[in-house]
């Protein structure tokens, strides 16, 4: 009967850190799978070696939700050469290929589970991944495979075939039919039956411990059926169905616990752990009551190492999965790729959010039991060589301090770390000679807790080294420690990364000063670790980026490191064109911060290296990098002024076409206190407009005065000609001038006349006119703020441009009047004002805020007429005093009124304010 075939990964063309192809050897709810390197070349390939030569019946692939290969090819081979060379493809026989869905219909929120039926014999299986499907989440053009499952039979099954043939012959003579409905759903008579427990979906959703129990109970059920113990088989069948639900629930709890650990919410993690243990204990108790559980079934499955939930390859900031994804059937039917491959008609997809990263292997539990002999287990239950460890008993432990936990771990509660590989032994040989193989093995362990404990143990060892230790031993220990620290800085687990930073800080600030080691040792520490630290500042995890950048800044300020001037030399190295956005931004941010802290005097930063770096950064493709470069250049200019200009192009119109250089040079102007080009252009434009406006107003006023004088002269000449006519001429035509005007010589016509309101009076001497302007003229008013006499028609313009308090006024865009600036926002917001009309359509009275007909004559009618402005206080005062006037005076006013009005209508009102000197000038004219 076909069953799951174990395999190991022989080689792969590459992988992203933390997503090795060896992850495919593990099937569990929390596996992360394999990912290709970022921006890799295609095709990518993986070679698997099955534990024995077998006939493959079925392949199952669990694709990633957004890192999806467009096509996967399959090759099979009987053997490999002594040394493996990927290019020797002729040893492999091509089976065919399958195409994967681009996942656009689900919005990259589902994982496709592809089942492919094959019939091929061999021991080596090669998978070739072609170009990825493009989507917005796969920003690094990667392909990934979460899991692969191989189902088949051993290739040497001649005896089994003969046995099957004999059984078929006996069945034929006994009249048994292999298609008998009574046998449907059983394992009998089905040599090609594949157990659902061997399906990939089963392992990807079940708690590993419960999955092992289910398989054991399934074996017992088959034995009970063979022995015709049907009641017991029925009980086992029900127990298996119930345990599958239990396993899925425990799997969800494990994921939630992992999420809490990643978020460092240890209270929630502890709560989930206790919840799992309590639920597991209740289930096992029920199984024991029904005599379905014994000591053999209680053996824990082999454990998996814990990795962080948030991976660096995610397209955006990722959050751990709150629960296991659900299977959902997709009704798409795939065509056969080639005759060798036959896909299952309906594929499945695992629903998962693209923002959620793949959840990684679990934290191992303790195991007080002796190790299981792997050779005595059925093949399906044999552990992989790299993970022969056990779960421990689920017990509730009292609170322990960090030191107690570390000691307990090192004491063997979690078992021993896996032995070092040959590659690791060669790589860490010098560290092993100094620190011992046990400590180095923990530092290389796949379980993150061992790696963290190794750093804590190393820190404790360094702190306890006596002062009298020989210098050579101290140096060797230092270099071995730096080797492990450098490796731990690259770790993707946050706690291990932070532990490496603490150890590095202790070495630099305590270990080296304590033992009085030379600066060469400090330089060795910095030079070996700063490159990998800078690399971590480009991590996709924001927390890791900030942690790494802050530590680099802190380390640069250590007095032991500051004098070496090493870190600044790394920060001013030119940015690589293919460097990540986060890395470039972090380097620029570090440079800007350390420049403020260290300056350019004996710090490793010089004007030359900083300016060359900053000018080159102005060409970077990322806006934030260019913006930071501009800030650095401006900060350098504040300190060094003219020296900075040597590294920049000349300040001319061609250079200023580049917006960055324009910003830089305008920033220089502001620093120097000079006006920028924009400000100078605005000032010149405003001055030109103001001069043109004044010129037009002066021309208009002079033209008006000239026209008025011409009209007056014409009237005087007409009156003189009328005076010399015979006295007996008929005067009933009404054209004769008033008697008062006949005796007025032309050169004295403007005497005793107000040129604003047109009133004439014998009292209008120079002093009398001043008094008239100051108190009585209906066309004038006094400014309440500067006490200057101005025309009412120009009061708004006076308040905005001429008044001593003009800075306190603003213009309302709605009513065009002057309003106090502190009241202007409320004034505009409430919109209570009467909107002004264009100047050509209407005049606007600043006293009553009303619009009226345009023109100069309309001002007189509005301000002096009885139906005009109601807010002209001078007119109101005159009207109140009118009843008290004597009849003689009233007739005098009435007689002079029409003449004054007629004469005044000929003279336009000048713009601008009126002073005593100006009034005298008008009176003399």
From Swiss-Prot:
Where does the record place a coiled coil? 209-289, 677-725
Note the Pfam families from the entry: CEP104-like_TOG (PF21040), CEP104_N (PF21038), CEP104_ZnF (PF21039)
Identify the keywords attached in UniProt to this record, alphabetized.
Cell projection, Ciliopathy, Coiled coil, Cytoplasm, Cytoskeleton, Disease variant, Intellectual disability, Joubert syndrome, Repeat
* Top-level taxon of origin: Eukaryota
| Annotated protein name in UniProt | Centrosomal protein of 104 kDa
Return the SUPFAM superfamilies for the record: ARM repeat, Galactose-binding domain-like
Question: Main site of residence?
Answer: other
Cite the residue spans of the region called Disordered. Answer: 883-925
Q: Which InterPro entries match?
A: ARM-like, ARM-type_fold, CEP104-like, CEP104_N, CEP104_Znf, Galactose-bd-like_sf, TOG
Q: What is the lineage of its organism?
A: Eukaryota, Metazoa, Chordata, Craniata, Vertebrata
Role this protein plays: Required for ciliogenesis and for structural integrity at the ciliary tip.
């Amino acid at each position: 009967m076909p069953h799951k075939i174990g395999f190991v990964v022989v080689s792969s063309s590459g992988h992203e850190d933390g997503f090795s192809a060896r992850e495919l050897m593990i099937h569990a709810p929390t596996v992360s799978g394999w990912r290709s390197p970022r921006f890799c070349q295609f095709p990518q390939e993986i070679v698997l070696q099955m534990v024995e030569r077998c006939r493959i019946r079925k392949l199952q692939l669990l694709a990633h939700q957004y890192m999806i290969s467009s096509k996967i090819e399959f090759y099979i081979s009987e053997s490999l050469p002594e040394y493996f060379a990927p290019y020797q493809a002729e040893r492999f026989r091509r089976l065919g290929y399958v195409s994967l869905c681009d996942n656009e219909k689900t919005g990259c929120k589902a994982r496709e589970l592809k089942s492919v039926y094959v019939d091929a014999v061999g021991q080596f299986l090669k998978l070739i991944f072609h170009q990825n499907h493009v989507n917005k989440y796969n920003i690094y053009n990667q392909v990934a495979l979460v899991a692969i499952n191989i189902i088949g039979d051993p290739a040497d099954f001649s005896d089994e075939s003969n046995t099957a043939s004999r059984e078929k012959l006996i069945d034929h003579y006994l009249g048994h039919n292999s298609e008998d409905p009574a046998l449907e759903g059983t394992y009998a008579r089905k040599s090609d039956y594949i157990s659902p427990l061997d399906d990939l979906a089963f392992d990807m959703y079940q708690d590993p411990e419960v999955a092992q129990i289910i398989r054991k109970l399934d074996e017992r059920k088959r034995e009970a059926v063979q022995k015709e113990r049907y009641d017991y088989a029925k009980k086992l069948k029900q127990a298996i169905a119930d345990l599958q639900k239990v396993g899925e629930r425990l799997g969800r709890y494990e994921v939630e616990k992992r999420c809490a650990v990643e978020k460092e919410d240890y209270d929630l993690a502890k709560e989930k752990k206790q919840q799992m243990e309590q639920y597991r204990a209740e289930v096992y108790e029920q199984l024991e009551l029904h005599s379905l559980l014994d000591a053999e079934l209680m053996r824990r499955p082999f454990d998996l190492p814990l990795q962080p939930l948030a991976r660096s390859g995610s397209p955006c900031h990722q959050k751990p999965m709150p629960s296991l994804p659900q299977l959902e059937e997709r009704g798409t039917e795939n065509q056969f790729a080639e005759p060798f491959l036959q896909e299952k008609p309906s594929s499945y997809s695992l629903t998962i959010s693209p923002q959620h990263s793949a959840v990684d292997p679990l934290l191992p539990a303790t195991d007080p039991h002796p190790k299981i002999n792997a050779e005595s287990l059925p093949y399906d239950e044999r552990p992989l060589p790299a993970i022969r460890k056990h779960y421990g008993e689920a017990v509730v432990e009292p609170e322990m301090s960090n030191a107690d936990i570390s000691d307990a771990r090192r004491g063997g509660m979690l078992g021993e770390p896996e032995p070092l590989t040959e590659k690791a032994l060669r790589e860490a040989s010098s560290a092993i000679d100094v620190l011992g193989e046990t400590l180095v093995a923990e530092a290389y362990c796949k379980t993150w807790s061992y790696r963290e404990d190794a750093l804590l143990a190393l820190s404790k060892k360094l702190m306890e080294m006596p002062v009298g230790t020989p210098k050579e031993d101290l140096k060797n220990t230092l270099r071995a420690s730096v080797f492990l620290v450098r490796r731990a800085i690259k770790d993707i687990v946050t706690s291990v990364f932070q532990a490496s930073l603490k150890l590095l800080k202790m070495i630099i600030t305590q270990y080296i000063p304590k033992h009085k080691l030379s600066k060469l040792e400090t330089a060795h520490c910095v030079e070996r670790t700063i490159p990998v630290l800078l690399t971590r500042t480009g991590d996709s995890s924001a927390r890791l980026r900030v942690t790494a950048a802050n530590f680099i800044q802190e380390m640069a300020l250590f007095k032991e490191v500051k004098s070496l001037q090493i870190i600044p030399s790394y920060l001013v190295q030119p940015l690589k064109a293919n460097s990540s956005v986060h890395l470039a931004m972090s380097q620029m941010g570090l440079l800007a911060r350390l420049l403020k802290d260290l300056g350019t005097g004996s710090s490793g930063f010089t004007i030359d290296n900083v300016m060359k770096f900053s000018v080159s950064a102005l060409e970077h493709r990322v806006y934030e990098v260019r913006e930071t470069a501009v800030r650095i250049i401006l900060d350098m200019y504040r300190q060094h002024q003219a020296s900075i200009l040597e590294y920049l192009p000349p300040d001319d119109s061609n250079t200023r076409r580049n917006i960055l250089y324009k910003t830089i040079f305008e920033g220089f102007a502001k620093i120097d206190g000079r006006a920028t080009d924009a400000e100078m252009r605005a000032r010149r434009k405003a001055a030109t407009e103001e001069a043109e406006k004044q010129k037009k107003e002066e021309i208009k006023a002079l033209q008006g005065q000239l026209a008025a004088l011409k009209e007056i002269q014409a009237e005087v000449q007409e009156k003189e000609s009328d005076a010399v006519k015979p006295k007996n001429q008929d005067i009933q035509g009404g054209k004769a001038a008033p008697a008062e005007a006949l005796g007025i010589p032309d050169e004295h016509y403007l005497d005793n006349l107000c040129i604003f309101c047109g009133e004439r009076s014998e009292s209008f001497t120079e002093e009398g006119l001043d008094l008239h302007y100051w108190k009585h003229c209906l066309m004038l008013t006094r400014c309440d703020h500067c006490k200057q006499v101005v025309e009412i028609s120009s009061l708004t313009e006076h308040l905005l441009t001429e008044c001593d308090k003009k800075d306190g006024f603003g213009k309302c865009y709605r009513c065009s009047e002057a309003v106090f600036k502190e009241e202007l926002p409320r004034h505009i917001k409430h919109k209570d004002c009467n909107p002004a009309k264009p100047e050509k359509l209407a005049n606007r009275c600043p006293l009553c805020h009303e619009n009226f007909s345009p023109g100069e004559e309309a001002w007189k009618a509005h301000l002096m007429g009885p139906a005009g402005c109601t807010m002209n206080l001078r007119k109101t005062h005159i009207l109140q005093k009118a009843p008290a006037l004597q009849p003689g005076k009233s007739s005098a006013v009435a007689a002079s009124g029409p003449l004054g009005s007629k004469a005044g209508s000929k003279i336009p009102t000048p713009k601008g304010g009126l002073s005593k000197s100006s009034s005298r000038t008008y009176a003399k004219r």
